[in-house]
Amino acid sequence: MDTSAVSYLSSIVLNNNYKEWNNEKIIKWLSDTKKIQKVIVFKIYEITGRDLEFLSDKILFKMGVGIRDLLSFKSEFEILKNNYDNNNNNNNNNNNNNNNNNNNNNNNNNNNNNNNNNNNNNNNNNNNNKNNNNSNSNSTNINNNCSNNNSNNNHINFNSNSNITNIKNNDSKIKNKKEENKVPIIDLNQYEYVESISLGVFSVVGKYKRKGQENEFIAIKKIDILSLNEEKIIKEINKLYSINHPNIIKIIGYCKDQKNYYIASKYYPKGSIKKNTKQSPYSEMNAKRISVKILSGIDYLHSLNPPIIHRDIKCDNILLDENDDPILIDFGLSYKTIDDSTNLKTLCKKPFWASPDVNNQEIQIFSEKTDIYSFGCTIFEMIVGWESYSKKENNQPNLQKLPDNLTISCRLALGDIIGLEQNFKPDSKDLQKLSWFNESLPPIFQSQELTKSTTNTTTTTTTTTTPPPPPSPSSSSPSMNENKKIVTSDCLINSFKESGCLIFLNGELMYDNPFDKDCYQYNIVIPFGTPHLREVIHKDKNKSKHLDKIELFIDDHLAKGLVIKLGNFKLDLSKEFKKTPTFIDSIIEYLLDLLQKDNDDDDDDDVPESIILNIAVGFYKYISNFITYQYVLNQPSHFC
């Protein structure tokens, strides 16, 4: 390891000052020592701060770092970190020994002082007893308070804390009485039962109609008092009543009798998403619209103090209102215990979408991560459809079952939420930053032409059915930047229809794919939920034997300059793939599957030309279809 780099990294680790990591210096060292070939990924991703210490395999793989490079870099840093930790532990042990000696001396001195103080306090208390009993009690309390600094007055402290505890208990009882009256009381006699909506472990939800009113309905959940802690039920009712979010069910009142609690809420006649997805799966656009609003509700719940954990998010617990907006329901009220300090809940029944870590627990403990995992599974359930997974095993979704035409941003989001890596699950705020939850999904084919979307053009021309092409990207015309701003999916689709998708390497035409709607929407199922893609591939002997050839082919093409052209619009893939290394992984996975289907048993040392040809054809075909599809649909402005 380079001496200057060792000194530099050591100073960072020693001071825990990771924010000062000089990205350029690290990259230079990595490049000079050839520790990582694709060092540019560090610069692209702006790896700074605590990332130096917490560069997990998942992060590095997503950045496009190969397995060999990953192990090399991590081993260098681990050696440095371990050396620092060992030295630091030795120093801590020495300091602890010194502190223990000092503490022993201080304790001996304090004990002597405490004995003297106690004697003085007792004398004062005796004198006060002769004068006035009431004054005696007060002075004793004063003496006790003054003596709290002594280490031998635990008995006095215990009595004092007991008094405080009693006061707090009394206050909490008063608060509970106030909270019990906070939720409006409904008169159940004004409603008549219509039908059952759902049946739970400890509760039944029914549809009720207001007497004398034809179209006034409410939903009432009946909870058996004997099956749960009544105090907890009251607490949960008040907590749920205080929730105020447009996509979370709102309690409108409650009542109780000797056997049951009755909790009333608005009735939603459209039913749950599960009911709707039984007919057919949701489109990605519709699933996204619902998911964004549910995520907003989850973030609201998790941001409360203490946070509220739903613990059973699924399509069956999401209703649709009159505008088809989602309403998250059923916060349970069926928990065995609720830890007031952490609000973590344990449950007597297993949730529908249980994360692997929850499945492995004898006593199931739920946290915010539980909700995030089940939320991702709910998105999966909407897109795939209920019937496709009504007979699934272990309630674990299979990302390879996703529809072929999903956008790359959707696959990445689902991979992060329900992928194999359980230790790096994003929270609700992390999810809201992902592109899929932020960007709008434009229709693949829109009816309007380019002339309808470019209102800033000032040229006066006769009406034409086909819009004029923009100036060449190499032109120095002042209007070039204006044209770049108005690049839309419509522009690219029109150009694609006219001239097809052309792929150039070093300016030479390598592949010409004419426009075809079915071919254009061609897509591949990509297991983006597998963070250790290269590692998994290496374990598969049938696939790994071609991995080096594919990587060499791709690196060679990107180094020479790979460009997609749709008419006069072009996209420099050599630059784009550095920003989105996940595309490289998807290409590699596709090519490996393609070669495996050919059942090629030739040795690595004797590579037939047919393998290279298959790699080239598959490479260009994948780019001209799937990659082009993703950029035209999601990032048209990247074309120039």
UniProtKB/Swiss-Prot annotation:
Bias regions of kind Low complexity — which residues?
453-465
Q: Which domain of life is it from?
A: Eukaryota
Per the record's keyword annotation, is Coiled coil included, yes or no? Answer: yes
Q: Indicate whether Cell inner membrane appears among the record's keywords.
A: no
Q: Which InterPro entries does the record cross-reference, listed alphabetically?
A: Kinase-like_dom_sf, PAK3-like, Prot_kinase_dom, SAM/pointed_sf, Ser/Thr_kinase_AS
* CDD domains recorded: PKc
Report which residue ranges the record marks as coiled coil: 73-100
Q: Which UniProt keywords apply?
A: ATP-binding, Coiled coil, Kinase, Nucleotide-binding, Serine/threonine-protein kinase, Transferase
Q: Where is the active site?
A: D312 (proton acceptor)
Which parts of the sequence bind ATP?
A: I197, S198, L199, G200, V201, F202, S203, V204, V205, K221
Q: Where is this region: Disordered?
A: 84-165, 448-482
Tell me where in this chain the SAM domain is found.
21-84
Stated family: Belongs to the protein kinase superfamily. Ser/Thr protein kinase family.
Q: Which PANTHER family match?
A: SERINE/THREONINE-PROTEIN KINASE SAMKA-RELATED-RELATED, SERINE_THREONINE-PROTEIN KINASE SAMKA-RELATED
Q: What is this protein called?
A: Probable serine/threonine-protein kinase samkA
Show the taxonomic lineage.
Eukaryota, Amoebozoa, Evosea, Eumycetozoa, Dictyostelia
